[in-house]
Amino acid sequence: MAVVAVFQGASFARDDYEEAVRRLTGGKSRMESPSDWPVEGLLVHVAGEGAQGFRVLDVWESEEAFNRFGETLLPILQEIGVDVSPDLYPAYAFVSA
Protein backbone atom coordinates (compact mmCIF):
# COMPACT_ATOMS: atom_id res chain seq x y z
CA MET A 1 0.00 0.00 0.00
CA ALA A 2 1.27 3.46 -0.89
CA VAL A 3 2.26 5.77 1.96
CA VAL A 4 2.49 9.55 2.21
CA ALA A 5 5.40 11.17 4.06
CA VAL A 6 5.24 14.86 4.97
CA PHE A 7 8.30 16.64 6.32
CA GLN A 8 7.71 20.03 7.92
CA GLY A 9 8.95 21.72 11.06
CA ALA A 10 10.39 24.84 12.61
CA SER A 11 13.95 23.58 12.11
CA PHE A 12 13.41 22.68 8.44
CA ALA A 13 14.02 25.40 5.84
CA ARG A 14 14.66 25.60 2.12
CA ASP A 15 18.43 25.82 2.69
CA ASP A 16 18.28 22.57 4.67
CA TYR A 17 16.35 20.89 1.87
CA GLU A 18 18.88 22.06 -0.72
CA GLU A 19 21.79 20.77 1.37
CA ALA A 20 20.06 17.41 1.86
CA VAL A 21 19.51 17.19 -1.92
CA ARG A 22 23.21 17.89 -2.57
CA ARG A 23 24.21 15.13 -0.17
CA LEU A 24 21.66 12.64 -1.50
CA THR A 25 22.62 13.21 -5.14
CA GLY A 26 26.37 13.69 -4.90
CA GLY A 27 26.19 17.41 -5.57
CA LYS A 28 23.15 18.05 -7.76
CA SER A 29 21.20 21.18 -6.92
CA ARG A 30 17.78 19.65 -7.64
CA MET A 31 16.01 16.32 -7.58
CA GLU A 32 14.77 15.95 -11.16
CA SER A 33 14.07 12.26 -11.69
CA PRO A 34 13.21 9.21 -9.57
CA SER A 35 16.70 7.98 -10.46
CA ASP A 36 18.09 10.79 -8.26
CA TRP A 37 16.85 8.96 -5.16
CA PRO A 38 19.18 6.43 -3.53
CA VAL A 39 16.46 3.74 -3.38
CA GLU A 40 13.58 2.64 -5.57
CA GLY A 41 9.94 3.09 -4.74
CA LEU A 42 9.31 6.84 -4.93
CA LEU A 43 6.07 7.70 -6.74
CA VAL A 44 5.79 11.47 -6.16
CA HIS A 45 8.01 14.17 -4.65
CA VAL A 46 6.89 17.76 -4.07
CA ALA A 47 8.73 20.48 -2.15
CA GLY A 48 7.66 24.05 -1.57
CA GLU A 49 7.20 26.88 0.85
CA GLY A 50 3.88 28.02 2.25
CA ALA A 51 2.52 30.10 5.10
CA GLN A 52 3.62 27.51 7.66
CA GLY A 53 7.14 27.06 6.34
CA PHE A 54 8.96 24.72 4.02
CA ARG A 55 7.32 21.36 3.37
CA VAL A 56 8.21 18.19 1.49
CA LEU A 57 5.60 15.63 0.51
CA ASP A 58 6.56 12.23 -0.86
CA VAL A 59 4.41 9.31 -1.90
CA TRP A 60 6.17 5.94 -1.70
CA GLU A 61 4.97 2.62 -3.08
CA SER A 62 5.19 1.08 0.40
CA GLU A 63 6.25 1.81 3.95
CA GLU A 64 9.19 -0.55 3.42
CA ALA A 65 10.42 1.56 0.49
CA PHE A 66 10.12 4.72 2.58
CA ASN A 67 12.02 3.07 5.44
CA ARG A 68 14.86 2.14 3.09
CA PHE A 69 15.05 5.79 2.03
CA GLY A 70 14.94 6.87 5.67
CA GLU A 71 18.07 4.83 6.39
CA THR A 72 19.93 7.22 4.08
CA LEU A 73 18.01 10.45 4.68
CA LEU A 74 17.71 10.58 8.47
CA PRO A 75 21.49 10.56 9.16
CA ILE A 76 21.89 13.37 6.61
CA LEU A 77 19.19 15.44 8.32
CA GLN A 78 20.90 14.88 11.68
CA GLU A 79 24.28 15.95 10.25
CA ILE A 80 22.86 19.24 8.97
CA GLY A 81 20.98 19.94 12.20
CA VAL A 82 17.42 19.28 11.09
CA ASP A 83 15.25 17.81 13.82
CA VAL A 84 12.10 16.80 11.97
CA SER A 85 10.24 13.51 11.81
CA PRO A 86 7.90 12.80 8.93
CA ASP A 87 4.18 12.51 9.33
CA LEU A 88 3.65 9.11 7.70
CA TYR A 89 0.26 7.68 6.79
CA PRO A 90 -1.31 5.26 4.31
CA ALA A 91 -2.58 6.79 1.10
CA TYR A 92 -6.33 6.41 0.92
CA ALA A 93 -6.38 7.26 -2.78
CA PHE A 94 -3.64 7.87 -5.31
CA VAL A 95 -4.18 9.19 -8.84
CA SER A 96 -1.47 10.17 -11.27
CA ALA A 97 -1.43 11.38 -14.86
Where would I find each of the regions flagged by the language model?
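Short S/T/G/P-rich N-terminal loop/turn motif that feeds into the first structured element of a domain
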Residues: 1-57, 61-72, 82-97
